[in-house]
Each structure stands twice: as structure tokens, then as C-alpha cells.
Amino acid sequence: MINLQNVSKIYRSKHGDVNAVQDVTLTIKKGEIFGIIGYSGAGKSSLIRLLNGLEQPTSGTVEVAGRKISEIKGKKLRKARQEISMIFQHFNLLWSRTVRDNIAFPLEIAGVSKAKRLERVAELIKLVGLEGKENAYPSQLSGGQKQRVGIARALANNPKVLLCDEATSALDPQTTDSILGLLSDINERLGLTIVLITHEMHVIRKICHRVAVMENGKVVEEGDVLNVFIKPKEEMTKRFVQQVTEPVETKETLKHFLEETTSGRTIKLTFVGEAAESPLITQIIRKFDVEVNILQGKISQTQDGAYGSLFIHVDGRENEVNDVVDFIKSRQVEAEVITNV
């Protein structure tokens, strides 16, 4: 569906060149939700603008839905963009138009008849859950409702690809989850390919099938979301994964505990799939002469299965504690002894 081959984008100015995107090669499959994550300045937004031709690459090729976006211009590019829609962080609605008229706007531009516009708008309003808000203006809507209008408008011309540029960054956590749920539902119902730009690993974990991590214009890591969570390779990726698995509260708890404890071992357990649901701690207590203290834990769902982490403290004779670590590993659970945070 989307292929990028050795794509680079350099912005030139009198103050010097900025290498926004550097030699990126990516393949995004039809019907998947693909996440691109990175901090500010990583090159995410520049990359997404290359996908719909808002920017042209300095080198390399960009192909979307069978068209080489990097090589077409004018009427052909405008036609290609009808198959590549986009939603934004700040909604970009027309404030003088109602919900109905905002959604109808791209259909008007495309020359669709009024009767067909009204029919399509009614379908989209139902799809995004805005029944009863047809005649409301953007100023009368919540942030989540505004983004739903943006999504409906983006879907008006039946695109093959939906680009989401920090689409949930301006929303509160509960509203973020509702919008992510809507995008996931649309992906399943319509088979729509979604490319999602974010700086929040929670967003990636929640709905993406695969993810690419960007730093300084480069893709430093790429893979299935569950695999990236289990075994992140790059330091940048590890920091993002820790947003979900080791939030600030967890680090504070561990730091305090390690400072106060002089015996035993503090162990981080990492569970994947069915192992996340096994009664491992009960088995340890029954099998070994040790004391087990559960410090903190969390199980999260990804599109490919469950992933969990649990921090425990095991105290007892050294040989018994060592046997516990070996036992944990024999149950297809990773065990890492924590000495500092």
C-alpha cells in the first residue's frame, strides 16, 4: 500500500541545511494501522507530509496506493490526494459551518450532487457517533466531538489511506481512548490503512499493528508492536516503552524500595501472551522457601496479545533466590535483577 525507498528531505535556508528525513525505507501493508513515534524534531511530521505530496522528497521515492507521489504533479497529484486523507491535532474545522456542512465540504469540492452529499454525510455522522449534532457548530462541540467531525470529513471521499498527525495530542486521556477506539473500529470495518504519528507510546500500544521509531530524521527501529515492547533494541525505543511499562510512579517506588532494602533481590518479570495470565507468584511461594513481596505490576493489551511487567522482591537464602530466578525463566518469563533505577 505504501512504499518509501531511501527517502530524504532536506530543508535549505540561509542559516544552513536541515536534514528532516534521512534515508528512510518503509513498507506499510494494506489495511494495517502503522505508528510512527518520535520526540519533537524527529522528522515525523515531515515524513507524513511526504506521503500526501505536501512536501516533495529531496531524494528517494514515495509510492502510495500504486501511485508514485514523489513523481506526479498538478491534476494527477490532486487526484491521488483524494485517496489520502488526513486528520490533525487542532481539528482544522470551518467554524462558520455546521457539523453537517463541515463533513460535506470535501464532497462539494469533488462535485458530488447535493442528494448524494446528504446521504454520504448521514452515513458518516452515524459511523463516528455524532447523531443529534448535525446542526451544531464547532464552538458548541467538545474536543473529542471536533475530532470526530475531522475523521468523518477525512472519510468523505472514501480514501484508501488515513494519515493522523498527532490526532489525540490535544485531548484528555479518556477522550484519547475513545478516538483511538473509533479509529480501530474504522480500520476493521472499512479495511482502511492508517498511518499514525505520535509521541505517546500509549497510543501505539493501544491500536497499532506495527511501529517505526524515529530519531534525528532516521528510522532507528521498526517492527510488530508486541515484539518492540518485549525486546526494544535502541535506547530511544526503550525510553518510549518505559512510558507504558515503567511510568514515573513505578520508578519512584523502586528507587525508594532499593534504598531501604539491604537483603534479597528485586526482580522485574516480563510476561508475554498466555504467560501473563499464569499464577507464577503462587507457584513460587508454594515451591520455594522464600518471601515474595509484590511491588508493582501492570498488564497491557496490544493488537497482537497481552504484555505485562511485574516487579517483585524475593528474600531468602541466596541459593533459594537463585533457584527462583531460574524457575521464572523456565516458565518463558523474562527475569531481570534490578540493582538501581
Swiss-Prot record:
GO terms for cellular component: plasma membrane. InterPro entries: AAA+_ATPase, ABC_transporter-like_ATP-bd, ABC_transporter-like_CS, ACT-like_dom_sf, MetN_ABC, MetN_ABC_transporter-like, NIL_domain, P-loop_NTPase. SUPFAM superfamilies: ACT-like, P-loop containing nucleoside triphosphate hydrolases. It is an enzyme of class 7 (translocase). It is found in: Cell membrane. This is Methionine import ATP-binding protein MetN 2. Residues 2-241 form the ABC transporter domain. It catalyses: L-methionine(out) + ATP + H2O = L-methionine(in) + ADP + phosphate + H(+); D-methionine(out) + ATP + H2O = D-methionine(in) + ADP + phosphate + H(+). Part of the ABC transporter complex MetNIQ involved in methionine import. Responsible for energy coupling to the transport system. It is a peripheral membrane protein. Its EC number is 7.4.2.11. ATP binds at G38, Y39, S40, G41, A42, G43, K44, S45. Keywords: Amino-acid transport, ATP-binding, Cell membrane, Membrane, Nucleotide-binding, Translocase, Transport. The complex is composed of two ATP-binding proteins (MetN), two transmembrane proteins (MetI) and a solute-binding protein (MetQ). Belongs to the ABC transporter superfamily. Methionine importer (TC 3.A.1.24) family. GO terms for molecular function: ABC-type D-methionine transporter activity; ATP binding; ATP hydrolysis activity. Pfam families: ABC_tran (PF00005), NIL (PF09383).
